């Protein structure tokens, strides 16, 4: 099951005033309901981006992106602001709830609604926009999660951030 689901359970799922119960089943539920959702979204991106040999550094200007891309990016920035505000108040539970909600929207709405864009046989601005948007969202969310899930965040960072930019800091925890 791992340390990250355990850390997520205690830091993000429980409020400080709640009696803490622990079992393998509880941690397995955290892993399957949240951690695996993020991991599967990340795996979807890496699989199709590598198959399509996407140049992730090639940006698509925001006004040229479809409305759904602008929507998820706006939600990502709102998530970052709300998570930062919660962590500045030492409210890990609220920060975790905001992150979980975003990951749910990213996986269950954005990726599912846009699969055809990723699966198109021809390359183009629409496909590049979909990849770039998903990359930006994953890049943001793993950084927000780093204090909660250091191992998962580091794995994603090394594959998304460091692999495309060797000048990037050595660890997600240094960004």
What are these regions (language model features)?
Residues 11, 52-81, 112-175:
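Acidic, turn-prone loop/beta-hairpin segments
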Residues 5, 11-13, 32-46, 66-79, ...:
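Core structural elements
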Residues 23-32, 91, 126-134:
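Membrane-interfacial loop-to-helix junctions in multi-pass inner-membrane proteins
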Residues 1-63, 161-168:
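Catalytic adenosine-cofactor/nucleotide-binding cores of aminoacyl-tRNA synthetases and other
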Residues 21-27, 98-99, 130, 157-159:
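Composition- and surface-driven signal marking solvent-exposed, interaction-prone regions
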Residues 83, 87-94:
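Short helix-adjacent coil turns
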Residues 28, 96, 142-146:
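Short, charged/polar micro-motifs that form catalytic or ligand-binding hotspots
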């Amino acid at each position: 099951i791992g340390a990250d689901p355990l850390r997520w359970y205690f830091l993000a799922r429980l409020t400080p005033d709640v009696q803490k119960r622990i079992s393998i089943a509880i941690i397995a539920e955290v892993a399957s309901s949240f951690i695996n959702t993020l991991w599967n979204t990340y795996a979807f991106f890496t699989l199709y981006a590598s198959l399509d040999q996407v140049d992730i550094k090639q940006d698509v200007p925001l006004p040229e992106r479809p409305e759904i891309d602008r929507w998820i990016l706006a939600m990502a920035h709102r998530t970052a602001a709300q998570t930062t505000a919660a962590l500045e108040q030492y409210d890990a539970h609220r920060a975790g709830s905001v992150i979980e909600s975003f990951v749910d929207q990213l996986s269950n709405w954005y990726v599912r609604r846009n699969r055809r864009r990723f699966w198109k046989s021809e390359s183009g601005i629409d496909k590049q926009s979909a990849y770039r948007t998903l990359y930006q969202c994953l890049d943001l969310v793993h950084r927000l999660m780093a204090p909660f899930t250091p191992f998962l965040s580091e794995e994603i960072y090394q594959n998304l951030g460091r692999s495309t930019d060797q000048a990037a800091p050595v660890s997600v925890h240094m960004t």
